[in-house]
């Protein structure tokens, strides 16, 4: 499967509430390692893409207060390439773009688990 068709399959998967909830759980798990927690509804209710990105954006902003090293450690845990992160740092909507990348990377983990299990 090529990259484009995998992206399309991932986009389609984000319409499935069970898949979205598993993605939210993965996000909460990875962020929890950095003492960044989400409200109960984040773990129990499949949210819209925009709402998830908003929650993620808030947590990233909190983590940035602790310094760039902590943020890079989180991105390493999520498996978001540093090169990709650096390309976003000059963007005016940095947090929104980074949150979107985090969501898609976490969703991709769930997609691959489902595909190969």
Can you annotate each of these PLM segments?
Residues 83-117:
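Amphipathic alpha-helical binding modules
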Residues 13, 17, 42-49, 88-92:
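Conserved phosphate/pyrophosphate-binding and hydrolysis machinery centered on Walker-type P-loop NTPases
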Residues 26-66:
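Short, contiguous, helix-prone interaction/anchoring segments in small proteins
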Residues 1-14, 60, 70-73, 104, ...:
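Hydrophobic alpha-helical segments at protein termini of multi-pass membrane proteins
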Residues 1-41:
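Membrane topogenic helices and adjacent juxtamembrane segments
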């Amino acid at each position: 499967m090529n990259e484009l068709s995998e992206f399309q399959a991932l986009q389609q998967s984000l319409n499935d509430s069970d898949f979205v909830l598993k993605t939210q759980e993965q996000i909460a798990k990875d962020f929890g390692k950095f003492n960044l927690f989400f409200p109960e509804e984040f773990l129990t209710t499949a949210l819209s893409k925009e709402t998830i990105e908003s929650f993620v954006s808030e947590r990233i902003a909190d983590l940035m207060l602790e310094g760039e090293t902590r943020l890079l450690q989180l991105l390493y845990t999520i498996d978001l390439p540093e090169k990709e992160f650096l390309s976003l740092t000059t963007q005016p909507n940095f947090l929104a773009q980074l949150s979107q990348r985090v969501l898609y990377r976490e969703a991709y983990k769930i997609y691959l688990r489902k595909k190969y299990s």
